[in-house]
Amino acid sequence: HFSYQVFALLTSVAMIVGVADYAVTKSYDERKLSFMDDFTITAHTGAYDTEMNTLEAVKAAIKNNAEIIELDIRQRPDKTLVMSHDIVVTNNDGAPLEDALALIKDTPDMQINFDIKETRVLNSLHALLVDYNLLDRSFLTGIEVINVKAVKDSNCANMDYYLNYKPSKFKAFSDDYRQKIIKLLEDTG
């Protein structure tokens, strides 16, 4: 185990030195980002330089031709689905998801990543996606291992979803641990 820690430390130091050297020796123009072919642009919580999870952010993502838009989904006490990262307490919190879907439906090349903050939204979300004919362009993220059963038991059971799971960087060298991860993936779909 000690050798893994030493390796991790040396790798971290090398990365820091490399980034620092790059930042110091390159001019601003040389440091501009360039994207490789088939790079996907995702508008996280809407779009850069807008307030998260707002209709303004959705409009900006559409205007900038984002290929995927990520929206955090929660439910108001009155059962309205809204875009919100934070817990929704009142019936005025968050922008209504239905308003965002009305904008997105006319953008046929945009996929939608719904970050599920609470599983009670799943059946209502599915109904909205069917109503707006967006089911085939949508997928779920933010799914914790303990929430997989709720997804599988919901109307969203046939949608693609991505599991939130952070495997150990150090245990990954163990065959037993890798088998545990494979089993977890099999069990969660």
Segments and roles (model prediction):
Residues 1-189:
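Phosphate-group recognition and catalysis centered on beta-loop-alpha active-site segments
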